[in-house]
Design a protein with these regions (language model features):
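C-type cytochrome heme c attachment motif
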Residues: 5-12, 94
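Typically the conserved alpha-helix immediately C-terminal to a functionally engaged Cys/Sec
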Residues: 10-23
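Short hydrophobic alpha-helical module
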Residues: 23-26, 51
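Short active-site neighborhood of thiol/selenol oxidoreductases, capturing the structured segment around
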Residues: 1-8, 27
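Residue-level recognition of beta-strand->loop/alpha-helix junctions
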Residues: 31-33
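Short, solvent-exposed mixed-charge patches
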Residues: 116-117
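Thiol/selenol-based redox catalytic cores and closely related redox-interacting motifs
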Residues: 36-113
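Soluble periplasmic/extracytoplasmic beta-strand elements of cell-envelope proteins
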Residues: 26-29, 94-96
Length: 117
C-alpha cells in the first residue's frame, strides 16, 4: 500500500490495520509522500523509517502526534516515491494487489477482502 503520513484516508486505513489483519490481509507499506521529495511529509516518513521503532513512530504520526524529525541517510523513501511515480501512483492510499492491479483509494476491510479475491 502506497501511503503518506499526512493523508487522511491513509490514517483511517492505518487505524483499522488490525481489522485487515484479522481478515487475513497482510499490509506492507510503501512510502509515497504526495507533496514530493522536498516536503515536510517526506521528512516525516523518512523520520519514521529511520527510527528504532518505525511502526510505533508511523502510528504516532498517523494519529497526528508531533514527532521530532530525524533524517538518516540509508532509507528507501526516495526509491519508493520514484517507483510510485513510475507506475502511475497519483494519490494515497494506493493498494497494489499481488497480480499488480491497482486499487486506488481507501476500501473498508470487508470490501478490500472481496476485491482481493
Amino acid at each position: 500500500i502506497f501511503t503518506d503520513v499526512d493523508c487522511g484516508y491513509c490514517r483511517k486505513f492505518h487505524n483499522e490495520i488490525q481489522d485487515f489483519n484479522d481478515l487475513g490481509i497482510t499490509v506492507n507499506y510503501v512510502a509515497f509522500p504526495r507533496s514530493g521529495l522536498d516536503s515536510v511529509s517526506y521528512n516525516k516518513i523518512v523520520t519514521a523509517w529511520c527510527s528504532k521503532d518505525p511502526k510505533s513512530v508511523l502510528t504516532k504520526m498517523k494519529q497526528g502526534q508531533d514527532v521530532q524529525l530525524s533524517i538518516c541517510q540509508n532509507h528507501p523513501v526516495e526509491a519508493h516515491f520514484l517507483l510510485g511515480q513510475k507506475i502511475g501512483i497519483t494519490g494515497t492510499p494506493a493498494i497494489i494487489k499481488s497480480n499488480g492491479e491497482l486499487l486506488p483509494g481507501y476500501l473498508p476491510p470487508e470490501e478490500l477482502l472481496t476485491r482481493l479475491n
